[in-house]
């Protein structure tokens, strides 16, 4: 099966890099699925979104992302997020607590919702 190079990077660190067969992400234009050979595109990631990567060996990598961009060429996908957390590293109970206690803090709510969704999709 055809493969592409994918990098998932947050401002403070690289979360994952490798070969993949599929990337799906939530953008401001809607959800996008990218396979090898996709037309070039640049998309803006939603606040509190989820990115899912199917690796070349069939593993599924899921991350909560908060803002940033998705850049696609025929052979590469780069996800540059303002902040991101792999689903396996998320404390879902802490995220739910933030949702319960955040009041009017819309940014905290968006980040917490993205974290909960990432764990649910993993």
Curated annotation (Swiss-Prot):
Query: Where would you find this protein in the cell?
Result: Cell membrane
Listed under subunit, the entry gives: F-type ATPases have 2 components, CF(1) - the catalytic core - and CF(0) - the membrane proton channel. CF(1) has five subunits: alpha(3), beta(3), gamma(1), delta(1), epsilon(1). CF(0) has three main subunits: a, b and c.
Name it. Answer: ATP synthase epsilon chain
Entry-linked SUPFAM superfamilies: Epsilon subunit of F1F0-ATP synthase N-terminal domain
Similarity comment: family membership: Belongs to the ATPase epsilon chain family.
Superkingdom: Bacteria
Species of the source: Rhodococcus opacus (strain B4)
Q: Pfam families recorded for this chain? A: ATP-synt_DE_N (PF02823)
Q: Which GO terms describe its cellular component?
A: plasma membrane; proton-transporting ATP synthase complex
- Transmembrane region positions? none
Entry keyword annotation includes Cell membrane: yes
Checking InterPro entries in the record gives: ATP_synth_F1_dsu/esu, ATP_synth_F1_dsu/esu_N, ATPsynth_dsu/esu_N
What this chain does, per the entry, is described as: Produces ATP from ADP in the presence of a proton gradient across the membrane.
Q: What are the record keywords, sorted?
A: ATP synthesis, Cell membrane, CF(1), Hydrogen ion transport, Ion transport, Membrane, Transport
Gene Ontology MF annotations = ATP binding; proton-transporting ATP synthase activity, rotational mechanism
Q: How does it sit in the membrane?
A: Peripheral membrane protein
Upper taxonomic lineage: Bacteria, Bacillati, Actinomycetota, Actinomycetes, Mycobacteriales
């Amino acid at each position: 099966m055809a493969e592409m190079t994918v990098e998932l990077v947050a401002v403070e660190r690289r979360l994952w890099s490798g070969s993949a067969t599929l990337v799906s992400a939530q953008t401001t234009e809607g959800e996008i699925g990218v396979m090898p050979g996709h037309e070039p595109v640049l998309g803006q990631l939603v606040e509190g979104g989820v990115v899912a990567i199917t690796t070349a060996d069939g593993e599924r990598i899921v991350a909560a992302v908060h803002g940033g961009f998705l850049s696609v060429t025929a052979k590469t996908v780069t996800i540059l997020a303002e902040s991101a957390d792999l689903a396996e590293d998320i404390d879902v109970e802490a995220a739910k607590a933030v949702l319960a206690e955040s009041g009017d803090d819309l940014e905290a709510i968006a980040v917490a919702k993205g974290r909960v969704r990432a764990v649910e999709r993993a």
